Amino acid sequence: VMLSMALSMVVVNCIVMLVQGYDFESYQNIFLASDFQLDQMTDTLSNTNFNGITPEIKGILNKCPESEKTGYVYYSEERHKMEPALLKTWETLAEKNKENWTDYEKQIWEETKADNTVKVHFLGISEAVFDMLEWKGEKCSWDTFKSGDYVIVDYSDKYTEQPVSYYQSGETFKMEYGNGKQKDYGVIGEAMMPYSLDYPYADSVYITVMVPEEEYITQTENQSAMYAAIDAKKGEDKQVKEYIDKNVLKENDMIT
């Protein structure tokens, strides 16, 4: 039986999905993170705005009376000096994937290996987004994570039956920020971001590292988010959409 379902989202006008014998709830948890999503992302990396959800917009969204919860994802690109174990993991992954890599991707790997630093998709996440993560292994608590002493790391081959870990819980991750700050974090777990809230552009050689929202702002001094994810109270979807249209989209037509 094939079922056609139209899902209205702010980030796009309409998504029509064909679902056949599929666990839609599991799909939704990974790929459709919230009822509404706002950002200033574009189809091309060169023209995108990773800081489109400003503090002013966050303030407006946080006051929406019909929303159940609103979460934020912050992004910056950092670099990380690879420990021997991480380098070995990436050497194994490169050998496995090189036949499928483009010449450009192979060049990126050679440069990564030569200077022994890997690109980091560094994400700050609020509690509402933390609750959306897809965990590999034991889940940590928000109360522990929000202390700012820990990071959550992504893992490779995330959509396969045997994903590959970059780090193990209990290991130390040394972060050297682009602004000169340094801090040692404990790795508290491995988790995958919902697809729609993750870094949206094609990339091959990188790791994803997450810290709580407050820690991200403290270390990077960036208060503007990449994404806002809003869940409406039951039966209040229309009211939330009207609130967003009137108070956010009317003032900034770059937000989708």
Locate predicted features.
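Short, strongly hydrophobic transmembrane alpha-helices
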Residues: 1-23
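Basic-flanked hydrophobic alpha-helices used for secretion and membrane insertion
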Residues: 20, 24-256
